[in-house]
Amino acid sequence: MKVHIVAVGKLKNGYVAEGVKDYYERIKHYIPITMVETKQENPFNMTTKEGFHIVLDAQGKLMTSEEFASFIEDLLTTQSNDVYFYIGGPEGFSEAFKNNAQMRISLSLMTFPHELARLFFLEQLYRALTIIKGEKYHK
């Protein structure tokens, strides 16, 4: 299984891009991962792409870091197909796009710029992996 991060839009803020790169490099030590930036909402046709598709969405399921770690651990142990996480741009995703996903998750009840959402998600994915491994990053 490989994890794919599919993000709409390019990162424009240097400090955000540095943070995203840092967490991406850290995550690569734990799991196979790719990250793709795209201009369009539907970079992969979810109906023809095998895998488990998850959209980050403000109305998605809220989880604590520990619950997210448990969710990721379940995916890693039970999912043979690739897992896709979709992070929207400034306009988010259409309902039609979101309805094609198997799951929606939310990072917070608060609203963030899409660039920061990407950074926050990668940090949470890294945190989840360290929780799974019993490492001391999460306190």
Curated annotation (Swiss-Prot):
Query: Which Pfam families does this one have?
Result: SPOUT_MTase
Q: What coarse category fits the chief subcellular location reported for this protein? A: cytoplasm
Function recorded in the entry: Specifically methylates the pseudouridine at position 1915 (m3Psi1915) in 23S rRNA.
Listed GO cellular component terms? cytoplasm
Cross-referenced InterPro entries:
Alpha/beta_knot_MTases (IPR029028), RlmH-like (IPR003742), tRNA_m1G_MTases_N (IPR029026)
The EC designation for this entry is 2.1.1.177
**Entry binding sites for S-adenosyl-L-methionine:** 56, 88, 107-112
Chain segments annotated as coiled-coil in the UniProt record: none
| Any one GO molecular function term | rRNA (pseudouridine-N3-)-methyltransferase activity
Keywords, in A-Z order: Cytoplasm, Methyltransferase, rRNA processing, S-adenosyl-L-methionine, Transferase
> What chemistry does it catalyse, as a reaction equation?
pseudouridine(1915) in 23S rRNA + S-adenosyl-L-methionine = N(3)-methylpseudouridine(1915) in 23S rRNA + S-adenosyl-L-homocysteine + H(+)
**UniProt-listed Gene3D superfamilies:** 3.40.1280.10
Whichever gene encodes this chain, its name is rlmH
| Self-association state and partner proteins as the record states | Homodimer.
Q: Does the keyword Transferase apply?
A: yes
Q: What is this protein called?
A: Ribosomal RNA large subunit methyltransferase H
By sequence similarity, the record places it as follows:
Belongs to the RNA methyltransferase RlmH family.
Where would you find this protein in the cell?
A: Cytoplasm
Q: Does the keyword Methyltransferase apply?
A: yes
